[in-house]
Swiss-Prot record:
It comes from Saccharomyces cerevisiae (strain ATCC 204508 / S288c) (Baker's yeast). CDD domains: PLPDE_III_DSD. Pfam families: Ala_racemase_N, D-ser_dehydrat. SUPFAM superfamilies: PLP-binding barrel. Catalyzes the conversion of D-serine to pyruvate and ammonia. May play a role in D-serine detoxification. Homodimer. Its EC number is 4.3.1.18. This is D-serine dehydratase. One of its GO terms (molecular function) is metal ion binding.
Length: 428
């Protein structure tokens, strides 16, 4: 990436090739700072330690991860050393980067896919040697059997496991009040399993919070997450009365539910944490550093808070049908959607770089492989025309998926000047 940076450093965003992905570093920094400070404020209001674990899956970069951890953010009131990864490659490459920098800003990694099967356990074992704290997900009795049969990981410690709690999305995990969950905990507390495995805590993710339409809705869902993991911990204590629940970490969050921490009135949450929570609370989330239209649709953030966009070019015009052609097709925008229509909202480059509201006039209505068809949000005759050859910023529906389509990201300041290029640790 040094060649790309040397070629484009100092250039204006208007001079960059398209399509490409651009990150506004000042907005990225502000988003990271805000989330860290919201968690810190909750901790102070409750008078108890509350952890934060940054999910790095959206951008998958070393420099972006450092910011999520609180480094280089002068206004951040806390830092963290704990991350969540969606692939083993993310973890390995971040640790490789850390080794090259002779630093240890990460010392706690959780792998978020329940994959304790023979194919992956040796890989998980090797990774356990490289970090002080490493957790894996389990949601199946066979996962426990597989770990037991493998034996302790290469770290020499016991396997540290998060039990995944299903919040009703039926993606992964078990409902805390299900017979399967009870059976899993009975197996977890059996003497043969205890020799090689220990519970780290319970993990819940309200994926359905992405369908929320107000921040008050997401606050209610955050309460549901907290209550679910707390109930899960109580089930464990009922199975093993000798177990001390204060040793557990109860990890909850999604970007929409975590964003509800910005609300001034958190009295119900604070009261529950201070009077009923049996273990240490941890907040986790990842998309917040970037944001996207799916997050805007939840009512928790504004479009000018998005820190990234796809840079495209207007290629042709079809006034008779009221459409334009751009090079922002499915290969760079994907087919993700939300309650906001289309596959992306177009914005003027001057406006999208500022931290203030801007008007929406065009959106990406249809996509094929390399073709993006733009339509006006209102009437063609009432919309500011876009000249052929002009550059546009397209706000993506889902940043995590969209960013996966690009080999690197141009990082610009609020004036649109390139100051860095970030390389993502993509694929597997």
């Amino acid at each position: 990436m040094s060649d790309v940076l040397s070629q484009y450093k100092g250039c204006s965003v208007r001079d960059l090739p398209t399509p490409n992905f651009v990150i506004n570093e000042e907005k990225f920094d502000k988003n990271c700072t805000t989330m860290l400070n919201n968690v810190e404020k909750l901790s102070q209001e409750c008078g108890v330690p509350i952890k934060f674990r940054a999910h790095v899956k959206t951008h998958k970069t070393a420099k972006g991860t450092l910011k999520q951890l609180g480094h280089g953010l002068p206004l951040a009131k806390r830092t963290t050393r704990a991350i969540l990864v969606s692939t083993l490659k993310e973890a390995e490459e971040l640790l490789n980067y850390q080794d090259r920098q002779c630093s240890d800003y990460i010392d706690d990694i959780t792998y978020s896919l329940p994959c304790c099967v023979p194919e992956f356990i040796p890989l998980l074992s090797n990774l356990s040697r490289r970090v002080n704290n490493f957790q894996v997900f389990v949601d199946n009795i066979e996962h426990l059997e597989n770990l037991k049969n493998f034996g302790r990981p290469a770290s020499g410690k016991k396997w540290s496991v998060f039990i995944k709690v299903d919040m009703g999305t039926k993606r992964a995990g078990l409902a805390f009040d299900s017979p399967e969950f009870l059976s899993l905990l009975k197996k977890l507390t059996s003497s043969e399993i205890k020799e090689v495995i220990e519970p780290y805590g319970f993990y819940a993710h309200a994926g359905h919070s992405y369908s929320s339409t107000s921040i008050n809705d997401t606050q209610n869902l955050l309460m549901e997450e907290v209550k679910a993991v707390n109930s899960a911990a109580k089930v464990l204590c009922s199975v093993d009365p000798q177990f001390d629940p204060s040793k557990l970490t109860l990890s909850v969050g999604a970007t929409p539910t975590s964003n509800s921490l910005k609300l001034d009135n958190k009295s119900t949450l604070v009261k529950f944490i201070t009077t009923q929570l049996v273990s240490t609370l941890e907040i986790h989330c990842g998309n917040y550093c970037m944001y996207d239209l799916q997050q805007v649709a939840t009512g928790c953030v504004q479009d000018h808070e998005l820190s990234g966009f796809v840079l495209g070019t207007v290629l042709s015009s079809y006034p008779s049908r009221g459409e334009l052609l751009s090079n922002t097709g499915v290969m760079c925008l994907t087919r993700e959607a939300s309650s906001i229509k289309g596959f992306g909202i177009c914005a003027d480059l001057e406006h999208v770089l500022k931290s203030e509201s801007f008007s929406r006039e065009w959106y990406v209505a249809r996509v094929s492989q390399e073709h993006g068809i733009l339509r006006p949000i209102r009437n063609w005759n009432e919309t500011t025309p876009l000249k052929l050859g002009s550059k546009i910023a397209v706000l993506p529906q889902h940043a995590c998926i969209t960013m996966g389509q690009f080999p690197y990201y141009f990082v610009v300041n609020s004036e649109g000047i390139v100051n860095d290029v970030w390389l993502p640790f993509q694929k597997w």
